[in-house]
């Protein structure tokens, strides 16, 4: 199987449970959503340049880096043709810790039964993204404490909706919850004040540290 890879690189993980740790990133082309704040829209364009790589070539590249954390991202990695075959191959290497960044619109059910199963960082798209109608709340039951559900917020309206979802589905008992500001649209201070005012326990404010270290628009970091 060939996969459309638009980027592959080693950097620190800018967010999530492994924030600040080295990771090897594999970014795939194409996404089924069109979030208005997306910082990788270029990877979803029809004419984006990509390299076709087999699962064995991807694994070989990962092993050559010597990095154990692996982040599959996009685009939407779970929509890649043959992604189960790639995940199965990666799962056979017990030294690798595979994380999948997924947008919340694809069912996770078919991606759980691996010996060395990947972890998920799953978005829940909020109203300001204009993509909330595509969210699959049925995915919540598949998440556990090695996973993350991420709420990317642009406004107080988004924060209130995130709080409603966290409460309705009792998410803090199931998985890790991160709230991340859309860069340049809402201040971290506003989020902290909201968390304090609403007693949001077991919720983590996440700042994308790669956008602090490098230019926010820089690729390959």
Swiss-Prot record:
[4Fe-4S] cluster binds at residues 31, 35, 38. SUPFAM superfamilies: Radical SAM enzymes (SSF102114). Pathway: Purine metabolism; 7-cyano-7-deazaguanine biosynthesis. It comes from the Bacteria. Mg(2+) binds at residue 40. Binds 1 [4Fe-4S] cluster. The cluster is coordinated with 3 cysteines and an exchangeable S-adenosyl-L-methionine. Its cofactor is [4Fe-4S] cluster; S-adenosyl-L-methionine; Mg(2+). One of its GO terms (biological process) is queuosine biosynthetic process. Keywords: 4Fe-4S, Iron, Iron-sulfur, Lyase, Magnesium, Metal-binding, Queuosine biosynthesis, S-adenosyl-L-methionine. It catalyses: 6-carboxy-5,6,7,8-tetrahydropterin + H(+) = 7-carboxy-7-deazaguanine + NH4(+). GO terms for molecular function: 4 iron, 4 sulfur cluster binding; carbon-nitrogen lyase activity; magnesium ion binding; S-adenosyl-L-methionine binding. It is an enzyme of class 4 (lyase). Residues 18-216 form the Radical SAM core domain. InterPro entries: 7-CO-7-deazaGua_synth_put_Clo, 7-CO-7-deazaguanine_synth-like, Aldolase_TIM, rSAM. Its EC number is 4.3.99.3. CDD domains: Radical_SAM. Substrate binds at residues 12-14, 27, 73. Catalyzes the complex heterocyclic radical-mediated conversion of 6-carboxy-5,6,7,8-tetrahydropterin (CPH4) to 7-carboxy-7-deazaguanine (CDG), a step common to the biosynthetic pathways of all 7-deazapurine-containing compounds. Homodimer. Belongs to the radical SAM superfamily. 7-carboxy-7-deazaguanine synthase family. This is 7-carboxy-7-deazaguanine synthase. It comes from Clostridium acetobutylicum (strain ATCC 824 / DSM 792 / JCM 1419 / IAM 19013 / LMG 5710 / NBRC 13948 / NRRL B-527 / VKM B-1787 / 2291 / W). The gene is queE.
């Amino acid at each position: 199987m060939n996969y459309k890879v638009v980027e592959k690189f080693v950097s620190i993980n800018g967010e999530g449970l492994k924030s600040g740790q080295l990771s090897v990133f594999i970014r795939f082309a194409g996404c089924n959503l069109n979030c208005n704040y997306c910082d990788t829209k270029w990877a979803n364009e029809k004419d984006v340049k990509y390299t076709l790589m087999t699962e064995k070539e991807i694994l070989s590249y990962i092993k050559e880096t010597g990095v154990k954390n692996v982040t599959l991202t996009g685009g939407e990695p779970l929509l890649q043709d043959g992604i189960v075959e790639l995940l199965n191959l990666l799962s056979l290497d017990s030294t690798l810790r595979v994380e999948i960044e997924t947008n919340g619109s694809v069912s996770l059910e078919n991606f759980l039964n691996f010996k060395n199963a990947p972890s998920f960082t799953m978005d829940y798209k909020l109203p300001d993204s204009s993509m909330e109608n595509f969210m699959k709340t049925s995915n919540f039951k598949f998440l556990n404490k090695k996973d993350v559900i991420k709420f990317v917020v642009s406004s107080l309206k988004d924060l209130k909706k995130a709080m409603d979802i966290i409460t309705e589905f009792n998410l803090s008992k199931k998985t890790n919850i991160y709230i991340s500001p859309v860069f340049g649209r809402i201040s971290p201070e506003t989020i902290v004040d909201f968390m304090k005012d609403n007693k949001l326990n077991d919720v983590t404010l996440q700042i994308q540290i790669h956008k602090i270290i490098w230019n926010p628009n820089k690729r390959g970091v």
